[in-house]
Amino acid sequence: MRYTKIVLLLTAVLLFVACGDANERYVRKAVYIMDHHGLYAQGEQWKATKKAALAEHPTTHEEAVQIVQQALQVAGGKHSFIMPADMVTVNVTSEWEMPSVELRDGIAVIYLPPFSGNDDEGRRYVQTVLDALPDTLSGAVIDLRGNSGGNMYPMIAAVHRFLPDDLLRFRNRKNSMPVDNDYILNVVGIARQAMIDCPVAILTNELTASSGEATLLCFRGLQNVRVFGTPTAGYASSNVPYPMPDGSQLVLTVGSDVARTGEEFCDAPIVPDSLTESPMEEAIAWLLKQ
């Protein structure tokens, strides 16, 4: 009986130590990823945060996650988060909304909703817009209100006929990567179509975020473009998911968006050219004057 109790006690101790080691390894791996890739993982604040995180000895997985979340806000900012394992394994469904195009006396009104579908659905998203566009227009409205993000490539590909090359750049701590139409279309698997030369009005609001903001920035600096509405959410940055031992993902902000103007955007809202609560009406009125 005593022997059995001793064995059970030793087993409990070993399990406790093993769990503690696993929790510390979880924190160390996350800190390593943040230290090497996090956009803001530099300077004294990060050094102090890193030191504090590694000095912790979490006894539960929940404690380890909390430590990582606190460090993540410093290394990656507000756009970074931990995606739980059960969300990582969820199959992408077709519950996303399709874009739409309405023609109004020579003006195309294009609604681009957020998108997180698969490759085939992405091509459907793009073709829905391209198939509805005539070759000649007097103007276009691109409605990004409520576009909270997802996969930016179908969004940009859907409106590539209004865009010249050199769309924008992604800048991380070490270098920057240019993004142009050919790259976008190659990723989506859509053939390039002829450019439509017309003025473009873009609508934004406080729900325009992430990939929605990246789509907006592709038009920044073009002379025949004007933005109407309210400031965006301020998530114009690049995220990368890193797998963690528990099946979750560390979704870390690794770069910022740079417009063709050279302006760099990340956590600050993008302010429209015309602040208005009636963006569609003002956009149409502006296009009719061009």
Predicted regions mapped to residue ranges:
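Sec-dependent signal peptide recognition
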Residues: R2-L9
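C-terminal motif of bacterial Sec signal peptides marking the signal peptidase cleavage site
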Residues: V17-A18
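Extended, small/polar residue-biased N-terminal targeting/export presequences
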Residues: L39-D105
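STAS-typified acidic loop motif
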Residues: P99-R123
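Gly/Ser/Thr-rich loop/hinge elements
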Residues: G149-A201, S237-P243, G247, V254-V258, ...
